[in-house]
């Protein structure tokens, strides 16, 4: 008896269904590194148009977390897809190396008692250790880049170029020194940049304090009254009692309506809209009378006494005054608030600051000298109470600025700092704010809402405090006049001389510099080196100049910056400002892409205390990095990205669908040589030509749309749908009969293999930017061998087909697919009640509208192959309808179709006539399916 299983083309796949990614990926990485794939790619891509994604440097401290992984994976997908699109897309990874967190860690490890040069040396060593750890993890994620030559903000050349960027901004006229209130962290002992501030709830005392008017005659006139009997008070409300010793004025809103109210305390001035609530706080319900009303502009330049100090307090008009809460009058301490500073500056009031750099009151401050501002709060609360000027006291929970590192409350404190001015006219007559807002207009945003967010932040941001009183940072290499505080007139030339020294020896070249090496003897008497370092956001914000503009393989401006949504106030903004404030005069990027933060499946932030942290190291060790990459790509990054073990298991199912599809494709291509066996498109079976159209359209959607627009979640959805619907549930399902049962080298089978070859090459290229390990594993089989890489190739080129023929082909097969779905649905009840096992056991009678019926009948005897039934008949009717029944034919042992011609050919008693021809004759021919 013949064993017909040996006559079918069931081939083993060289691409296993189990990926075993966690085990295989490290070995592949080692091999790629040894082959110098990144370097080879640079040679291959030489001369192509450039695409530059500039890496926002992660901070060199601690292991990478899942947010880092998302960021680097998204960048890598872009670099790979741009490379395959025909660009030269080098990727230079970087690290942010200076700053307080490293200082804190070094102090923990080694203490504080050491020479500053040794301290900086230890900071440099610590940063290098952290970089080595993080680099290993980034490489493990499959991120392609120049890992042997990354940029570090602590590289001598980068430090030197950061100093040069400072020189650029100095020459542009935006740098100035001022004693302004800035966000100050008592734990850091330093001012903070806007990006280093976070807001969380804090409970604070809320008090109403009365300021006695000096001249009630002038007050009466402001309210249009002939006179006022008794005492009168302006009442303020504040949640920062510790600032009252620095109170130098009270601000009223020029257009706000104020009432003069007679109360048991005396005459009180309160905003009309807030008076009722204020009087309730003071417990005044009886003996109240509204005497008059006026607007805030009439109160300007009235004078009061301080509620507990001997100090004259003028009434000012301030635009910052609102009637949202409080009393409508604002106690004004220019040393402790930006708006306070601005209004006092307008009136020429000289700033008084009673709080030192440790957050303690100076010795001249009565009662609270030597106390920290937080210790002093209860003492200061007693003070106006003793003078009879405390009207109400309570607690309030409100959003308050905290240090992002120490999580402790900040204070506004006036300090001598260096600023980049937002509204100061530069050497070109333009303000930095105007330039930056124009630069926002010239930038493309992904997602689009990023534009409004960045624009509003730039519109509202204060001047940028760029100086820091720290040790581990790029120095502000200026010489400052000892008496006037002015910069040396030759600062630009001196900066360049210092930069040249730093390029040779690093920042220590400045810290160890004797000023006599660069200044004349006379200048040495009058000028000192500035001891400040630069804000680390200036370091990273200057990398477009220190890295992108300097490295030969890169081009300025970068095409794309890609970071988390917090970087609108961080790196995106600092880079924008340095770009606009320098001679470049524009943003250093053309596009900005923002991704959300990673949360758990319930939308909660990752937290060790909750126990919901998903570490990337755990994911790639258990599932493989390709699963993590597929998760990142399949999630809409414009919002929060949810991750958990359950979510990763679902992602694994999608991966399995793609992998199983590839395994099937490779199995059926294992005896196919595209040079010798390919069938010209015009001679291919019709459904094979249709499948090529589907594959080409998929490639067009991804290569022409989703990848260039960074819509990776749509790309993944489309790939999985193509594998499961177009291939798995339709084309490959139909194709199995022809692949397995026709002669191995028949035109019918070679036509199918020709289609599969094009589909497979295209599919591997399409998945490779996302599934970089799986893509390379597959390319080893269908590409040019082990030394070849999928990255060395651009998108697949399909055989050409004219538009009219394609449109007709798609229309026809769309109708056939619709009919097939109806047939499948009609057979389902027969399967459910065990009348038939598979659809091949059934016959179908189809009623269809005329056009569809024409398409179906055009397939002739091959219609049954397209519908996966043993027999199909078609007749014309108004609507699509299918009647299915069990076939009365006999099952062919070889093809499993049920026919009435099993055993019709002598010597082939258990197989159908078609199979007999395929085994012993010339083989069947196919035209349609």
UniProtKB/Swiss-Prot annotation:
UniProt organism field: Neisseria gonorrhoeae (strain NCCP11945)
PROSITE patterns in UniProt: AA_TRNA_LIGASE_I (PS00178)
Residue positions binding ATP: 608
Subunit structure: Monomer.
Short motif 'KMSKS' region, span: 605-609
Domain of life: Bacteria
Catalytic activity annotation: tRNA(Ile) + L-isoleucine + ATP = L-isoleucyl-tRNA(Ile) + AMP + diphosphate
Alphabetical keyword list: Aminoacyl-tRNA synthetase, ATP-binding, Cytoplasm, Ligase, Metal-binding, Nucleotide-binding, Protein biosynthesis, Zinc
Membrane-crossing residue ranges in chain numbering: none
Comment on protein domains: IleRS has two distinct active sites: one for aminoacylation and one for editing. The misactivated valine is translocated from the active site to the editing site, which sterically excludes the correctly activated isoleucine. The single editing site contains two valyl binding pockets, one specific for each substrate (Val-AMP or Val-tRNA(Ile)).
Keyword field contains Aminoacyl-tRNA synthetase: yes
Enzyme class: ligase
A Gene Ontology biological process term: isoleucyl-tRNA aminoacylation
NCBIfam families in the cross-refs: ileS
Name the UniProt record assigns to this protein: Isoleucine--tRNA ligase
Function: Catalyzes the attachment of isoleucine to tRNA(Ile). As IleRS can inadvertently accommodate and process structurally similar amino acids such as valine, to avoid such errors it has two additional distinct tRNA(Ile)-dependent editing activities. One activity is designated as 'pretransfer' editing and involves the hydrolysis of activated Val-AMP. The other activity is designated 'posttransfer' editing and involves deacylation of mischarged Val-tRNA(Ile).
Stretch forming the signal peptide: none
Positions contributing to L-isoleucyl-5'-AMP binding: 563
Cofactor: Zn(2+)
Protein location: Cytoplasm
């Amino acid at each position: 008896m013949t064993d017909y299983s040996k006559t079918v083309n069931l081939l083993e796949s060289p691409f296993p269904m189990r990926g075993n990614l966690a085990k295989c990926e490290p070995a592949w990485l080692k091999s790629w590194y040894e082959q110098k794939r990144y370097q080879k790619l640079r040679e291959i891509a030489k001369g192509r148009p450039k695409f530059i994604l500039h890496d926002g440097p992660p901070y060199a401290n601690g292991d990478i977390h899942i947010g880092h992984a998302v960021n680097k994976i998204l960048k890598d997908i872009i670099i790979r897809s741009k490379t395959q699109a025909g660009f030269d897309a080098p990727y230079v990874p970087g690290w942010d190396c200076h700053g307080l967190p490293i200082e804190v860690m070094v102090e923990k490890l080694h203490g504080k008692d050491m020479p500053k040069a040794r301290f900086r040396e230890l900071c440099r060593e610590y940063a290098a250790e952290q970089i080595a750890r993080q680099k290993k993890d980034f490489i493990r994620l499959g991120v392609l880049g120049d890992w042997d030559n990354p940029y570090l903000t602590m590289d001598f050349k980068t430090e030197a170029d950061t100093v040069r960027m400072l020189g650029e901004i100095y020459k542009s006229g935006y740098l100035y020194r001022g004693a302004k209130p800035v966000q100050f962290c008592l734990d850091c002992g330093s001012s903070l940049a806007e990006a280093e501030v976070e807001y969380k709830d804090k409970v604070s005392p809320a008090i109403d304090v009365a300021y006695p008017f000096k001249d009630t005659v002038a007050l009466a006139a402001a309210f249009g009254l002939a006179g006022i009997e008794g005492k009168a008070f302006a009442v303020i409300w504040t949640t920062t009692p510790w600032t009252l010793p620095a109170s130098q004025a009270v601000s009223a809103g020029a257009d706000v309506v104020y009432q003069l109210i007679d109360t048991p305390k005396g005459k009180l001035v309160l905003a009309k809209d807030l008076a009722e609530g204020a009087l309730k706080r003071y417990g005044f319900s009886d003996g109240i009378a509204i005497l008059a009303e006026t607007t805030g502009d009439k109160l300007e330049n009235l004078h009061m006494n301080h509620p507990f100090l001997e100090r004259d307090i003028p009434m000012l008009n301030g635009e910052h005054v609102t009637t949202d809460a409080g009393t409508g009058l604002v106690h004004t301490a220019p040393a402790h608030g930006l708006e306070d500073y601005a209004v006092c500056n307008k009136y020429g009031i000289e700033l008084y600051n009673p709080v030192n750099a440790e957050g303690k009151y100076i010795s001249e401050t009565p009662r609270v000298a030597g106390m920290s501002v937080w210790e002093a709060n209860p003492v200061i609360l007693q003070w106006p109470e003793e003078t009879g000027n405390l009207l109400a006291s309570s607690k309030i929970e409100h959003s308050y600025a905290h240090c992002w590192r120490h999580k402790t409350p900040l204070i506004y404190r006036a300090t001598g700092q260096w600023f980049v001015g937002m509204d100061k006219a530069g050497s070109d007559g333009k303000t930095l704010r105007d330039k930056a807002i124009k630069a926002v207009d010239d930038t493309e945003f992904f997602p689009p809402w990023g534009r409004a967010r960045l624009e509003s932040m730039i519109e509202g941001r204060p001047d940028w405090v760029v100086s820091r009183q720290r040790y581990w940072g790029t120095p502000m290499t200026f010489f400052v006049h000892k008496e006037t505080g002015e910069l040396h007139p030759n600062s630009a030339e001196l900066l360049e001389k210092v930069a040249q020294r730093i390029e040779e020896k690093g920042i220590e070249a400045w810290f160890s510099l004797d000023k006599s090496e660069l200044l004349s003897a006379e200048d040495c008497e009058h000028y000192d080196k500035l001891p400040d370092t630069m804000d680390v956001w200036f370091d990273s914000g200057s990398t477009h100049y220190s890295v992108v503009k300097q490295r030969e393989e890169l081009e300025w401006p970068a095409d794309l910056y890609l970071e988390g949504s917090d970087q609108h106030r961080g790196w995106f903004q600092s880079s924008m400002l340095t770009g606009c404030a320098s001679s470049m005069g524009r943003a250093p990027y053309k596009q900005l892409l923002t991704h959300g933060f990673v949360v758990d499946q319930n939308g909660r932030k990752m937290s060790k205390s909750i126990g919901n942290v998903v570490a990337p190291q755990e994911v790639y060790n258990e599932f493989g990095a390709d699963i993590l990459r597929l998760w990142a790509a399949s999630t809409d990054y414009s919002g929060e990205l949810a991750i958990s073990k359950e979510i990763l298991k679902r992602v694994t199912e999608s991966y399995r669908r793609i992998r199983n599809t590839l395994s099937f494709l490779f199995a059926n291509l294992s005896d196919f040589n595209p040079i010798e066996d390919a069938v010209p498109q015009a001679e291919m079976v019709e459904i094979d030509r249709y499948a090529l159209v589907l594959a080409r359209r998929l490639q067009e959607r991804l290569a022409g749309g989703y990848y260039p627009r960074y819509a990776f979640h749509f790309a993944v959805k489309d790939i999985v749908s193509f594998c499961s619907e177009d291939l798995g549930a339709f084309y490959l399902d139909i194709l199995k009969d022809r692949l397995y049962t026709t002669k191995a080298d028949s035109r019918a089978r070679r036509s199918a293999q020709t289609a599969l070859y094009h589909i497979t090459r295209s599919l591997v290229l399409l998945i490779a930017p996302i599934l970089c390990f799986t893509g390379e594993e597959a390319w080893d089989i269908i590409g040019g061998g082990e030394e070849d890489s999928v990255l060395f190739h651009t998108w697949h080129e399909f055989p050409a087909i004219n538009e009219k023929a394609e449109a007709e082909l798609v229309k026809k097969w769309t109708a056939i697919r619709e009919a097939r779905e109806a047939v499948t649905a009609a057979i389902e009840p027969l399967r459910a009640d065990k009348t038939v096992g598979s659809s091949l056991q059934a016959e179908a009678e189809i009623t269809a509208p005329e056009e569809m019926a024409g398409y179906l009948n055009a397939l002739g005897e091959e219609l049954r192959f397209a519908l996966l039934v043993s027999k199909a008949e078609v007749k014309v009717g108004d609507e699509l309808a299918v009647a299915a029944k069990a076939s009365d034919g006999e099952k062919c042992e070889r093809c499993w179709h049920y026919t009435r011609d099993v055993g019709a050919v002598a010597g082939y008693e258990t197989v159908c006539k078609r199979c007999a021809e395929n085994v012993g004759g010339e083989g069947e021919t196919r035209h349609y399916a």
